[in-house]
Curated annotation (Swiss-Prot):
Disordered as annotated region, ranges: 1-27
Protein name: Small ribosomal subunit protein bS20
Coiled-coil annotated spans: none
Gene Ontology CC entries for this record: cytosol; small ribosomal subunit
Protein encoded by which gene: rpsT
Function summary: Binds directly to 16S ribosomal RNA.
HAMAP family with a match to the protein in the record: Ribosomal_bS20 (MF_00500)
Example of a GO MF term: small ribosomal subunit rRNA binding
GO biological process: translation
UniProt-listed InterPro entries: Ribosomal_bS20, Ribosomal_bS20_sf
Family, as annotated: Belongs to the bacterial ribosomal protein bS20 family.
Keywords: Ribonucleoprotein, Ribosomal protein, RNA-binding, rRNA-binding
């Protein structure tokens, strides 16, 4: 345990941020999984809406600083290409 007052405060804020980031990442993984499952099922309409929702959540995670923008771009690109392969 820290003895310095400012470090005790930092520990509290870091813990809050960790829990917030964990919640965002968890919902993000769920959205991506739903999109992948819709693609595997072959439902084009459901897949496009799921990918749109996942892309939106990825962008929000980037703006909150939870994930890097390039990581989000890679995930969005992969999901979009899977949906495009369904439509072709």
């Amino acid at each position: 345990m820290a003895n310095i007052k400012s470090q005790i405060k930092r520990n509290k804020t870091n813990e809050k941020a960790r829990l917030r980031n964990k919640a965002v990442k968890s919902s993000l993984k769920t959205a991506i999984r739903k999109a992948r499952e819709a693609v595997v099922a072959g439902d084009v309409e459901k897949a496009t809406t799921a990918v749109r929702d996942a892309s939106r959540q990825l962008d929000k995670a980037v703006s909150k600083g939870v994930i890097h923008k390039n990581a989000a771009a890679n995930k969005k690109s992969a999901l979009a290409s899977k949906v495009a392969s369904l439509q072709a």
